[in-house]
Amino acid sequence: MSFDLPVPVLLAIMRLNERGHEAYAVGGCVRDLLRGVTPNDYDICVSCTPQETHVVFAGERVIDTGIQHGTVTVLLGGMALEITTFRADGEYLDGRHPASVRFTRSLREDLRRRDFTVNAMAYHPVTGIVDLYEGEKDLKKRLIRCVGDPEQRLTEDALRILRAVRFASQLNFDIDGDTARTMHRLRDRLHLVSRERTAAELIRATAESGAVPALGEFSDVVFAALPDFPPLAWISGLKALSHLPAGDATLRMAALLHDCGEPALQNTLDSLRQSRAFREEVLALCRQARQPFAPDETAVMLAMLGEVQLRRLVRLQQAAGVLDEKESAQRLARIRAALAADLPLSLRDLPVNGKDLTAMGLAGEEVGDTLHTIHQMVLRGRLPCDRAAIIAWLTRQKK
């Protein structure tokens, strides 16, 4: 079996081979090639040390991205190629990282340390696939299975428990029975892993098309990673998630959390340790999830949330059963109409400003309060977005 590798990947492997080093495409890119999917990136494993890799690619830009683990990044032909020395990991003392890394000349040793069989295959454009752990067979069976003993693999790095869930969600695969049983048994080891690492895997798992069956089967694993998540909100969260397309991590996380209630919602979001923008967007969606907005509030909601967030809210409310399909379509149509009307979605867009109000005799907080009132009236269609009309209204109010 052969694949059309990108030219920079082929060139890198050829240059390494010409210097007497073994080199293979490895891991997720091989898995994706076998599935007929174009890989997002290509990793290369090699028999030479990082220092020898530097020599091979003298004249190219080489970045020491993880040299202590044998990894350098070579910029070649417009691609960033991670090139990593074959290695064997030492003992994992903290359930997260190997205490030591030993470079080796053996591809077999390198593949043996990897997490799952579907990620433990290598490919050379001349000699073909190297598959020591039946990864291709598991791909055909649509199965996530640990390399070797699942107890050892999952004890080494507890994050692999969530990685298995994420791969099952991403690939729409099942998880091998022995691997699954070990995941359930070792779930409490997730406390050894940083919140940032667990959150990244959970968010990616939630965003994928196979999230509902994967998360549903391993709810105990999710609760171990998110101890503040109230179990009573779990079923409605999965149900809402099942009605949404894959891809939008913000919307799909909001669907999963929308019934949590306070303070569990805030605590769970805080525990994810994500960006402030992500937390605030999910929080806003969850808090509005059960409150459909009235027709004359469309522009107000658009000004408050923005177009992307308001469209998300409508989709979330439909997924949660608050709106039916017809009601959802009507609200999306209102959003389009409000955008086409070119309404002032911020105070800056009004045809009057604070100086105008000050010139009319307003002062202090009254200026801001009045601008806000004008903005709300314009958005609700109760006052034209016209300078003369607004000045006339203000004049009447002063009498």
Residues covered by each model-derived region:
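Catalytic cores of the polymerase beta-like nucleotidyltransferase superfamily
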Residues: 1-399
